[in-house]
């Protein structure tokens, strides 16, 4: 599950039911079932990284299972050698603080983009050198379908696309932040990598944030 510098991660707490509909389930039995399923699917004895999906209650439904129970289930599986590291997905700062009393947290996966960038966990991740994976970096496509004029103008300045500028802005927020880019088109994936070479000035980043009425 780990090769060529890549680490495969999986996520528990969300699964499809009998009619192929996503539902939340972070119960102890569901977590064990999901981990065992991922082990079989990936053909490995140990998962490098498993995220516990929580849900912040704003954008995504939260499972009623107490966080401590869910984490203890993962810690037990970890002690059995079935997973190496534990991360949190869609978590709040209180979630993180509680989790750290139970087990080390190796990575964070939260929603973060130009439209939604108020997450105090990023500051913690930066200070602790903990990878922070930003999902929905293009605001579920809104920054592509209806790119604000100021974003388009900034993209023109850097001879880039609005998506590339949005990703470059994310990368500049923290050395620990990594945008999660989802695509089925290899060309689109290559286009996104251009964001790595875009060095936006601090002034331009501030202008973009101010124009979009963002909070730092």
Please place each PLM-identified region on the residue numbering.
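A short, structured active-site edge motif that brings together acidic residues
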Residues: 4-18, 52
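Active-site groove signature of glycoside hydrolases
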Residues: 39-60
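Acidic (Asp/Glu)-rich catalytic clusters
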Residues: 1-7, 39-43, 100-101, 123-128
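Beta/alpha (TIM)-barrel catalytic core signal, keyed to glycine-rich beta->alpha loops juxtaposed to Asp/Glu
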Residues: 55-216
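Active-site mouth loops of central-metabolism enzymes
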Residues: 18-29, 58-63
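Short, acidic/polar
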Residues: 27-41, 92-96
